[in-house]
Amino acid sequence: MSQSSKARLSTDPTVFEAVLNNHTPMMQQYLRIKAQHPDMLMFYRMGDFYELFFDDAEKAAKLLDITLTRRGTSAGEPIKMAGVPYHAAEQYLAKLVKLGESVVICEQVGDPATSKGPVERQVTRIITPGTLTDAALLEDKRDSALLALLVHESTLGLAWLNLAAGQFSVMETSVNNLTAELERLKPAEILLPESLNLAGINDRVIQEKLCVKHLPAWQFDTAAAVRNLSRQFGTHDLSGFGCEDLDVSLGAASALLDYTRLTQGASIGHIKGLRVEREDTYLRMDATTRRNLEISETIRGDAAPTLLSLLDTCSTNMGSRLLCHWLHHPLRDRGLIQNRLNGVSFLMGEAGSGPCLSVRDCLKRVTDIERITARIALKSARPRDLSGLRDSLKRLPAVNNAVAGTATTSSGGSDVSAHVAALIHSMAPDNALVALLEKSLKEEPEVMLRTGGVIADGYDAELDELRAIHNNCDEFLLQLETREKARTGIANLKVEYNRLHGFYIEVTHAHTEKIPDDYRRRQTLKNAERYITPELKAFEEKALSAQSRALEREKLLYGELLDMLSQYIDHLQQVARSVAELDVLATFAERALALDYSLPLFTSDSVIEIQAGRHPVVEKQVDSFIANDVQLGARTGGRRQMLVITGPNMGGKSTYMRQVALIALLAHCGSFVPARSALIGPLDQLFTRIGASDDLAGGRSTFMMEMTEAANILHNATAQSLVLMDEVGRGTSTFDGLALAFAIARYLLEKNRSYTLFATHYFELTRLAEEFAQVANVHLRAVEHKHHIVFLHAVNEGPASQSYGLQVAALAGVPDPVIRTARRYLLKLEQEALSNQPQGDLFSRDDLFWKQDRMPEGSVDKNDSAPEHPVLALLRTIVPDDLSPKQALEQLYGLKKAAEKE
């Protein structure tokens, strides 16, 4: 910041006043307001433009790609200026918010015609990434959360607010869970005490450009928090919310509330309470697991293909946002899960005969009631918001008709009907509310209130009169002219209007003797006189001001309408929640029918049994998908706790593991699952250690990241956790990696006792099954022909025979000479391993294999002789009498696929 900039924003009154004296009155006004918001861009209203000055102008010009100009001077330097049109401000604001900027809106509130000096201006609202409510600034299908954090000793207090939905939540956890909570909540903006410095926050600010604001520490005072929050909720205390023991998170909530009030410049009356989240409410997932499962974002940061992109066919934006929330917050309460599953079952009906499609069709015409309700509370709802709300409320009874009979016992059971019926009952619109909206609004109101045409005819007598004057001006003049001709007997009398003289009656000089006494001369012309009468004068005053007065009257009536609608905030929020939930349940039903999903079953036994499971996302990306079983937990002969998974690269190990986790996640969300059947015991957490990545900003290598993730799992996994471990130890030397992988596997078996899928290329780990009864080996099959590999993607019992790494390298396009050299080195290593001889120096120039690398062009490597056809190789391994019908069919598909690739 330049010295002149520091002086303009100085907190020293003497310095600041000295700076002001060098500026015009208007610029003094600007600087006084700007000094209150030094760290934000300020849109300063001047006529039809929002202007920015000094450093704000330079910054905005770069960010928005707008012209940087000058206006006057300051301390001998030109004042930089940039501006955007008032009517197009939203598109510029949206861009700034996406870049993480906050913007102060300073409006003209005085009348330029009556102002002496600069027009009075004041800040009407502050737009920040976490406090958005305008439809033009928000993503339709994504929530925008404001998060406040406070730390006391090892306790992390969180409070977050979705202002556009009126949802306010708090929770407390260990400070070690900061990264996991940031990944779960995905806040648009974070508030911290000035004294708090969190490493996890700093890392993410650098990596993801998070918007972080530091507030005075006193705003997080826990002693004052209860009073502040109780005053907002209109309660004596907070005992009704179950948060008496959450002092740290309440301090964060109080600071968040104050910040939100400041930004809105209006009451936030739709924030009527808070919800307490406990750590055991949801199936927990750390940040790594959420990323690896690609729930709503791919590893590369794309929105598709993900689990959310596959499932989100919701009819409403409210439903889409709730679906995303459900996928990131799988429930642990079996009763709540069963309620959702019952609802889905009912909406599907027998053989797809349920009402889900008709419900979805009705909901497609329902607007975003949730966000409109917030804008009503904040007095920022626009006319089309209200007309959309009116039309949506009128359509909701059709949903009831679509699910007629849900209040009685259906084929799915009485509980099914009761759950859906409860949602239908909760979304029934208040008749008085609908009547008010119908009576007050035009059928198709104008987009903006400033243009008028919003309030319905017949709603207000004064407005009707003003409109009649404005709209029927010509008709009145013709009627007056006819009456005056009859009264005076002057046939050529005219009643007319012009901008300079207003309304007048024109009479030629030949008829001046017939002029009545109530005519008053307004203008003399060469051949005529122009007059005005008391009646015409009164009409003129009304007509000339009718349009502006009508607009002011509409604004007044619209404000009163918003006040009346505020009485229905609780009702509208309940309607919105019910519509969103019914939408998600109907979407689950539609997806289950379209994608052939089945109803998951839950048990109190420690077991995960899935028959013919599929990866929900991958199966839609390929022509055919091989379904596979998984069995973990209690079984005859003991508890099958760990599967050691071997097989070739690209053989499907990671897909197999992920599909197990995704099936478990979907079941806990209340969705049907991509499997023939699924039986799931109690789960508390999902963990994944999959893939390779580094953290350059944090100074952590790929192997360090891998070990950090493994350490987190070993410290936190329980006997009710599902753990996916993929190729642990590959980031270091062979022996180090193998030793670590073996030790980690044993720790998971003996200490954590978690359900574990352990994929590896260390075939030595398959010996765990010999040492531990709770370990089983499975592998994904592949066959080779002429050094080409065919992946069968079928999971079979027992360990794999080899990894097929060279064949996969060839598929990746590694040059043939490299593959041939690698094959010879591999042969030597295998021979040495079999002969139990010390490993030779593969890279010595005296080595036989180094010399063979220089074979004459066109010569044939004897090791390249072709083995038998892969289909024949596979057929030789099949024992028909040992195959079930299902396994035989899978083998047949594998043979066909192998044959087609030849």
Swiss-Prot record:
ATP binds at G647, P648, N649, M650, G651, G652, K653, S654. GO terms for biological process: mismatch repair. GO terms for cellular component: cytosol. PROSITE patterns: DNA_MISMATCH_REPAIR_2. One of its GO terms (molecular function) is mismatched DNA binding. Coiled coil: none annotated. Keywords: ATP-binding, DNA damage, DNA repair, DNA-binding, Nucleotide-binding. The keyword Nucleotide-binding applies. HAMAP family: MutS. Belongs to the DNA mismatch repair MutS family. This protein is involved in the repair of mismatches in DNA. It is possible that it carries out the mismatch recognition step. This protein has a weak ATPase activity. This is DNA mismatch repair protein MutS.
